[in-house]
Swiss-Prot record:
One of its GO terms (cellular component) is Golgi apparatus. Belongs to the cation transport ATPase (P-type) (TC 3.A.3) family. Type IIC subfamily. It is found in: Cell membrane. Keywords: ATP-binding, Cell membrane, Ion transport, Magnesium, Membrane, Metal-binding, Nucleotide-binding, Phosphoprotein, Potassium, Potassium transport, Sodium, Sodium transport, Sodium/potassium transport, Translocase, Transmembrane, Transmembrane helix, Transport. This is Sodium/potassium-transporting ATPase subunit alpha-3. GO terms for biological process: intracellular potassium ion homeostasis; intracellular sodium ion homeostasis; potassium ion import across plasma membrane; proton transmembrane transport; sodium ion export across plasma membrane. The keyword DNA repair does not apply. This is the catalytic component of the active enzyme, which catalyzes the hydrolysis of ATP coupled with the exchange of sodium and potassium ions across the plasma membrane. This action creates the electrochemical gradient of sodium and potassium ions, providing the energy for active transport of various nutrients. The active site is at residue 363. The sodium/potassium-transporting ATPase is composed of a catalytic alpha subunit, an auxiliary non-catalytic beta subunit and an additional regulatory subunit. It comes from Gallus gallus. Mg(2+) binds at residues 704, 708. Residues 1-21 are annotated as: Disordered.
Length: 1010
């Protein structure tokens, strides 16, 4: 792809510009306008809605409220690509030349031989079968838009001319007045004008798992975070709301993400690039040799027809016909193996991409963490207690004997609206489903585990009044009867933002006794609050108060709207803090990535402090590495005075990222080894991925929301979450983690590296036999000897004996250094490099050719033709009219007899290639280790050795083969001609690998380590 900058077509330029516009943050101003201004802007009435005629006009202008599907490639085009791409073209040319040669022969001779006809048919069949196979494997296409379609709401409740009406969502237009209620999907982007207890689930868009409250007030400059906008295709969870439509179809926020995901040019996968490079290389060699010898044979005086037949022979000998099938089978096998390890690979070539990954951008919630809020710490009796956050409750426990803890657990259980869903008595507490928000269910599970049934506690302390949590007073309060029948006081319990709770208290509970809340205790509270907050935890304060019986007698009517009871001078009990804890297997996985040279970057929408705490917990920021803020705190200097290059780690806030240029982003990615991006938006995730790719990294990205789909699509490999992932993210991804676990990615990396190694080995094995296939033709033309190996016999090797052994190398186990190497550099570290070619063609291949020729000369000599009399004999040998050709001993040979000897030589040459390929298969098992270290555990490979030998014997001895393939039975002794050469190959390569291991980086490694 040259630089098409100047000649860029207007369409291409426009496409590029649109994408850049999409990458910018969502630009909206409606949330900052008053309701009247919004209605004026869209010419609508906030009570009556639009008129029918106006709505029709707008619908005609803007088009339906639907997403446009992306352009797709027709299936027949894809099929043709498989049939006419790469090697296939060469083989087609070969097949056409065969038919051509047969045609010429049929026209000029009385009894044309059918060789060329059969060969042409076989070549065409090979191409069609491998083409169908590859097409079948690749028959998954961009289904991104289809999953977006499922997300589009079907019906909408619209108010027009003051009447409520149900419309198809596609007919909703800008300016329409729309109502949504709990359970509805939002039909377009709305500016809320009135709401009652409305909450929406924006997780598919922003990744925030908590339902977000919606109200008419502008609460944030960023339209994605403000409360008065709801977005197309998010879900309304509870309550009702009414709003004015401000965008429809592709112009909605969700529509822009859809366009962004389908509009991204997806680059070729690294393995596709490698295979293409390899095909060009081999094709180049084949065409060059074919044409050179075509010209040479014409100069040497052969006829056109003979020259064409040579050309076909050389092309057939040069092209590894079975190779593309081998590659596809290798990738399919690995994909199956990964599916067993919870990685579902959608795009076969992505398997290898994962192996060359050098940067992983991972989500935090649910990928690195368990995706369940859990109580992590408590502060009571003036000390911090640690709770157990492990998935299987194998961690620490704390002292539950204090009376303060009893009071604290009471408040946490009673001042809590979360309940376990029914019918889960036999399910472990941590696995139970809860109705209620994340923090409350964390408290519920914690109390249930440590203090027994919360349900019983609530039955004994009947609730008589409650003020639910709201954002203005930031607390939740309830009033209960006490369980002691002799105590007629009411118990008031309250939880909320710690500083707000503390302000309402005048005493504090220590060891179960109330003490006055003095400055010293306030400072202790402040320190505990800061410490827990600094761990990235979400802290809540708890207090209680027994209402005096004389003021609040039994049956007192508590009024929660116009509060008629005491809500200050309460007694502070303690703090509890919650966090979504890291998954158990993640720190180990991050460590493995580090030793494999892979940089792990955390990208999250969460708060920087929480993000940093989790990053330290899982080892993304390793012990002893500091951020700029840490250095500033340690040296007691302002952050601006610290040189950013001194800090190995850094935490970048989304708002800062928004204002950075590409150069600044590159600077960060180059200078810091451990990076956390917090509070990022989906567009920023895409910018981070592109930044890493500018550095030349191969990037894997994990994501689960719709918001992640552009980044998943842009990354070299997108990894979606199987359990929590939205449909859209699964469609955009190349791979799905069925258990949502980061550790599975590392398994994937190992498998990806293994497949690359094994493909190299497979190709090295397959290419080596090209030399003993080509050299017979060269000598046939140059030295004028009878043909040592026929074209049909070559196909028997490439599509017969070599297939199973080549595929068996895909089952080879990893060598010991696989996860200790740096990721491969796609620019310099090719699948097929000069060293592999020099080993296969220049060294091992040459020894194999010698073995073949040795068998050939032995058989002819045994029949009376010594090597000395063979040179220059070809013209008389192939002449049908000469039936009295003399050998070295003066015996006369007819044409038919000569041909039987020649075909026996073909068979012997074929068998000797099989024998030397035994050794080649065994040495290809390893690239660096000795075969004795690696062992012979690969059962498929052992089967391959036996299978190719059995096939060779079958082709040689089966009756009728002399007619079908011109294979003749051999004397047993002729099988042994190639044995010494096979042994030589094995010894030669073991010595080479020994030198390799003894002198790493030495001359032998530079020249021969592929």
């Amino acid at each position: 792809m040259g630089d098409k900058g100047e000649k860029e077509s207007p369409k291409k330029g426009k496409g590029k510009r649109d994408l850049d516009d999409l990458k910018k943050e969502v630009a909206m101003t409606e949330h900052k306008m008053s309701i009247e201004e919004v209605c004026r802007k869209y010419n609508t009435d906030c009570v009556q809605g639009l008129t029918h005629s106006k709505a029709q006009e707008i619908l005609a202008r803007d088009g339906p409220n639907a997403l446009t599907p992306p352009p797709t490639t027709p299936e027949w085009v894809k099929f043709c690509r498989q049939l006419f791409g790469g090697f296939s073209i060469l083989l087609w040319i070969g097949a056409i030349l065969c038919f051509l040669a047969y045609g010429i022969q049929a026209g000029t001779e009385d009894e044309p031989s059918n060789d060329n006809l059969y060969l042409g048919i076989v070549l065409a069949a090979v191409v069609i079968i491998t083409g169908c196979f590859s097409y079948y494997q690749e028959a998954k296409s961009s289904k991104i838009m289809e999953s977006f379609k499922n997300m589009v709401p079907q019906q909408a409740l619209v108010i027009r001319e003051g009447e409520k009406m149900q419309l198809n969502a596609e007919e909703v237009v800008v300016g329409d007045l729309v109502e949504v209620k709990g359970g509805d999907r939002v039909p377009a982007d709305l500016r809320i004008i009135s709401a009652h207890g409305c909450k929406v689930d924006n997780s598919s868009l922003t990744g925030e798992s908590e339902p977000q409250t919606r109200s008419p007030d502008c609460t944030h400059d960023n339209p994605l975070e403000t409360r008065n906008i709801t977005f197309f295709s998010t879900n309304c969870v509870e309550g009702t709301a009414r709003g004015v439509v401000i965008a429809t179809g592709d112009r909605t926020v969700m529509g822009r993400i859809a366009t962004l995901a389908s509009g991204l040019e997806v680059g070729k996968t690294p393995i596709a690039v490698e295979i293409e490079h390899f095909i060009q290389l081999i094709t180049g060699v084949a065409v060059f040799l074919g044409i050179s010898f075509f010209v040479l044979s014409l100069i040497l005086g052969y006829t056109w027809l003979e020259a064409v037949i040579f050309l076909i022979g050389i092309i057939v000998a040069n092209v590894p016909e079975g190779l593309l099938a081998t590659v596809t089978v290798c990738l399919t096998l690995t994909a199956k193996r990964m599916a067993r390890k919870n990685c579902l690979v959608k795009n076969l070539e992505a398997v290898e991409t994962l192996g060359s990954t050098s940067t992983i951008c991972s989500d935090k919630t649910g990928t690195l963490t368990q995706n369940r809020m859990t109580v992590a710490h408590m502060w009571f009796d003036n000390q911090i207690h640690e709770a157990d956050t492990t998935e299987d409750q194998s961690g620490t426990s704390f002292d539950k004997s204090s009376a303060t803890w009893v009071a604290l657990s009471h408040i946490a259980g009673l001042c809590n609206r979360a309940v376990f869903k029914g019918g889960q008595e036999n399910v472990p507490i941590l696995k139970r489903d809860v109705a209620g928000d994340a923090s409350e269910s964390a408290l519920l599970k914690c109390i249930e585990l440590s203090s027994g049934s919360v349900k019983v506690m609530r039955e004994r302390n009947k609730k008589v009044a409650e003020i639910p949590f709201n954002s203005t007073n930031k607390y939740q309060l309830s009033i209960h009867e006490t369980e002691d029948p002799n105590d007629n006081r009411y118990l008031l319990v309250m939880k909320g933002a710690p500083e707000r709770i503390l302000d309402r208290c005048s005493t504090i509970l220590l060891q179960g006794k109330e003490q006055p809340l003095d400055e010293e205790m306030k400072e202790a509270f402040q320190n505990a609050y800061l410490e827990l907050g600094g761990l990235g935890e979400r802290v809540l304060g708890f207090c209680h108060f027994y209402l005096p019986e004389e003021q609040y007698p039994k049956g007192f009517a508590f009024d929660c709207d116009d509060v008629n009871f005491a809500t200050d001078n309460l007694c502070f009990v303690g703090l509890m803090s919650m966090i979504d804890p890291p998954r158990a297997a993640v720190p180990d996985a991050v460590g493995k990535c580090r030793s494999a040279g892979i940089k792990v970057i955390m990208v999250t929408g969460d708060h920087p402090i929480t993000a940093k705490a989790i990053a330290k917990g899982v080892g993304i920021i390793s012990e002893g590495n500091e951020t700029v803020e840490d250095i500033a705190a340690r040296l007691n200097i302002p952050v601006s005075q610290v040189n950013p290059r001194d800090a190995k780690a850094c935490v970048i806030h989304g708002t800062d990222l928004k204002d950075m240029s590409s150069e600044q982003i590159d600077e960060i990615l180059q200078n810091h080894t451990e990076i956390v991006f917090a509070r990022t938006s989906p567009q920023q995730k895409l910018i981070i991925v592109e930044g890493c790719q500018r550095q030349g990294a191969i990037v894997a990205v994990t994501g689960d929301g719709v918001n992640d789909s552009p980044a998943l699509k842009k990354a070299d490999i997108g990894v979606a979450m199987g359990i929590r992932g939205s449909d859209v993210s699964k469609q955009a991804a190349d791979m799905i983690l069925l258990d949502d676990n980061f550790a599975s990615i590392v398994t994937g990396v190992e498998e990806g590296r293994l497949i690359f190694d094994n493909l190299k080995k497979s190709i090295a094995y397959t290419l080596t036999s090209n030399i003993p296939e080509i050299t017979p033709f060269l000598l046939f033309i140059m030295a004028n000897i009878p043909l040592p190996l026929g074209t049909i016999t070559i196909l028997c090797i490439d599509l017969g004996t070599d297939m199973v052994p080549a595929i068996s190398l895909a089952y080879e186990a990893a060598e010991s250094d696989i996860m200790k190497r740096q990721p491969r550099n796609p620019r310099s570290d090719k699948l097929v490099n000069e060293r592999l070619i020099s080993m296969a063609y220049g060294q091992i291949g040459m020894i194999q050719a010698l073995g073949g020729f040795f068998s050939y000369f032995v058989i002819l000599a045994e029949n009376g033709f010594l090597p000395s009399c063979l040179v220059g004999i070809r013209l008389s040998w192939d002449d049908r009219t000469i039936n009295d050709l003399e050998d070295s001993y003066g015996q006369q040979w007819t044409y038919e007899q000569r041909k039987v000897v020649e075909f026996t030589c073909h068979t012997a040459f074929f068998v000797s290639i099989v024998v030397v390929q035994w050794a080649d298969l065994i040495i290809c098992k390893t690239r660096r280790n000795s075969v004795f270290q690696q062992g012979m555990k690969n059962k498929i490979l052992i089967f391959g050795l036996f299978e190719e030998t059995a096939l060779a014997a079958f082709l040689s001895y089966c009756p009728g083969m002399d007619v079908a393939l011109r294979m003749y039975p051999l004397k047993p002794s002729w099988w042994f001609c190639a044995f010494p050469y096979s042994f030589l190959i094995f010894v030669y390569d073991e010595i080479r690998k020994l030198i390799l291991r003894r002198n790493p980086g030495g001359w032998v490694e530079k020249e021969t380590y592929y």
